[in-house]
Amino acid sequence: MTYGHQLTFGVLLDPDAARPGDGVLLDPDAARAGDSVERARLAEELGYDVVAIAEDPDGLDAWTLLSWVAARTGRVQLAAHTSVPPRDPAMLARSAAALDLLSAGRVDLTLTTGERAEAKGEAEAIEIIRGVLDADDPRPLTYRGEHYRIPRMQRGPLPAHRIPIQISGYAHSLLQIAGRTADGWVAELAVLGPDGVAAANKVIDEAARAAGRDPAEIRRTLIIDPGVSTDDLLPLIVEEGAGTLLVRSTDPTVLRRFVKDAIPALREAVGKTAGTVPGRSAAVRAKRRAGIDYDRVPASLAETAVEPGDVEYARVRNTYLRGGAPGLVLRPRTTAEVVDALGFVRAHPGVPFGLRSAGHGISGRSTNDGGIVVSVAALNGIEVLDEAKRLVRIGPGARWGDVAAALAPYGWALSSGDYGGVGVGGLATAGGVGWLAREHGLTIDHLRAVEMVLADGTVVRASADEHADLFWAVRGAGANFGVVTSFDFEVDEVGDVGFAQFVVGAEDPAALLVAWGQAIEAAPRDVSGQLILGPRRPGQPSFAQVMAVVDADQPDTIIDRLQPLAAVGPLYDQNVVLLPYAGIMANAAEGYHRAQGDPVARSGLIEHLTPEFAAAAARMLASGAVHWFQIRTVGGAVSDVPADATAYAHRSANFSVVAMGSDPRRVDAVWRDLYGYFDGMYLSFETDRSPDRLTDAFPPATLARLRELKRRYDPHHLLRDNFTIDPRGGQR
Amino acid sequence: MTDYGHDLQFGAFITPTAQPAHQAVELAVVADRAGLDLATFQDHPYQPRFHDTWTLLSYAAARTERIHLSGNVLNLPLRPPAPLARSLASLDVLSGGRVELGIGAGGFWDPIVAMGGRRLSPGESVAALEEGIEVIRQVWAVDRPGPVQVRGEYYQVVGAKRGPAPAHDINIWVGAYKPRMLALVGRAADGVLPSLGYLPGGAEDLAGINRHIDEAAGAAGRDPRAVRRLLNIGGRFAPTGRAFLDGPAEQWAEDLAGLALEYGVSAFILAADDAPTIERFAAEVAPATRQLVAEERTY
């Protein structure tokens, strides 16, 4: 029988075998060190899957050597054959996580017992290692075992992949551990013989079943001497289920011969019985959510899909602003895979569905509880299509900081929000209010064509000439109509820009707002920016943060433009720098999203910051219900585009206003007083999902047209995560 | 004026952040290419935001060519000395003699204990470090007869095989501030490695540090020049001078030359997590400081 594992081959760089008989040895350690590294590189070059390094009491430290080898190889799996003790399980886990991150997920651990025959603490060590690596669990790790005690340590870091932990040995106690909890079992063929392997497998399988596990969860690895014939190896694979063979040799000739003769013959002989991707363990499957047909995930997506029990889950469950617990995250890498993903979503009509580019969305949830998330993060290409026309093609999963960095060498920029961590897909289907908005318009105003997958799986190209109706809709309400898989933009020539950050006194926030609004409206279009206010804190001075970008590279011009902005209130601090646009966008936090909770954001678009509006805003700030109040500049080139040219229709506004809080009732109670001053809103900054908000986001004519298009392109209402337009809804 | 006459070294003190995974390695590569002498990483094994420092050092050593690497400083309470000695020797062999041992007695006991380590009083931790250094030196001393024999209060390593032999004499630099630890440095270490930011009296405290070390060295029959004085520093480059190590590179050089000539500091390790700062430290500050000190020393 086999256990269904993909057959892999490795090299065990065994210190005993490494004791070279050839060559002149001046410094045995140094020679052997170089030898091991060279053999590891050779093994990778020859196509071996695994390089295993065993502890050598007389030689180099195995972990140090493995770390070195990791840095000098790029593909091969790195197997540490090591013992606890002397290694401490918690420290070993930290080390394994580090090397796994550095080597992009190539580490696996095999616990050996050295001279000791019986198990002693290995089961506890496995629990501790797994506990440390489970960084998704926010609780500290506490462990009270017979061999180890950990009072209360922080878990993590999260490794790059699920690090397999295998057990090596022959004693019943070790086989039991292998069956009960380990991811694999490693044994030497020469010690056990084929009959011994069969007997050990039986013990492991029984222990696995007794623990409620499928014996196939445990990969069987045999260490073989190079002399063993293919005929002897074949039954070990097809009958005893060996999934990995580790050749114990450091002789290049032997390593080459095994690759040339044995591996192809073995692969061919077992081709029909082995070679599938191993399924998820019972422990992982136990965390699956109801209503999702996990076994029907399309083959093209299975390898990259993430479900709650996976290590990768911690990296994909939350977004920048929200905690989430989706039941499945599909991560297509191509348009065809997006088609497959939407097919899977269509087969789950009652299950929540979120679409994510980089997970920065406020209106678009892009995570959920128990539903499906399709993340297009892997569709992150940035490609110049036509240098003369400044035409670039960008994938929805790219982040704007990366886009800015990629365009900078050409002297180009695409105004696109103010934070480098925002993804292209969400912003470029909604609007895009950026640092150059007044001069160069919205991000969508630079869009020339998209490729998108519609709800029914059709792939279309939309532009002014093809599917012009969709092209209109995708610029402002794109999330309702499909998954854009690439955007063609015409970008601008932008040199260095002036970037100013002022701290101004806000004792009288209403006066400040009016003064700032007037200064902005009076400024030439090469000035865009924003103003941020927090709640008033009793007894403390009040400040506002004023930021501005001046698209000019002459310091005199920049200073000239900034003077009126610096004069809107008492200036407490200032910082003005001349830098490339990409330098402003290089502000994204690193690492995966760890947000918790659910924010409340309200958006409004407004033409002028009148004294009446400013007074209402000041009252709102004084209430304490809002902890973040931000006004961005639009107008200018944004207003040059006719209101009916795109689904983003509120073109007359000069300002985009956002308030954020945490309690929707408290926020709405104070937001109500501002609401009357607005002429619509920018949907990207709004969290309210009530259908009324649709009429704020889209004027009647726009909404009517969108609803008609929604009926045509998404009649079954598949796309409903971000300002959804119900195709069955009435004409508002 | 105290000057022990050491050649000047310049290094980077790089945060071993686990995210992005390669940031620390890439900065070590930058430091290597820029011509710095040392790339160092702090070691807080209880802090999961950081890479395991030993794994990072090993990986970074394999990605660099010339620069020496060290923990700054390795945490002895969570890194038992015999395996640590073997790891150091192994990396020294692999890297062609580019590893040094910055080590500390442990300072943050709560998280050390929370991870399963043993809480020691300040005095105990000094004694433990002295034993640890003894174990490490015995493991490295492959030419001495018999196995490792340390029957200490904190570490008992009896009968362990010596080796592997390091490729060069690995320096042992101790993070030390207080008299007992400084006395240990004077007796048994190759260098002292404090952080300027932790000196309550600023650079002037270095005089007291030197005095304790020199007295202990003398009492142990060692030449004070056997102990290198290293220093972790922080600063920022600015167009005009505002304060100590806050100004243009030329001012930095004068500030550092002052420390070298006044207090005998001969290794400056700059806390920096960005490539331009590391490159500027190497290209502008290091040569100018060396020149100033050389000019002064010729008088």
Report each predicted region and the residues it spans.
Chain A
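Active-site-adjacent structural elements that line small-molecule/cofactor binding pockets in enzymes
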Residues: 1-285, 511, 528-534, 539-564
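Soluble FAD-dependent oxygen oxidases
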Residues: 262-732
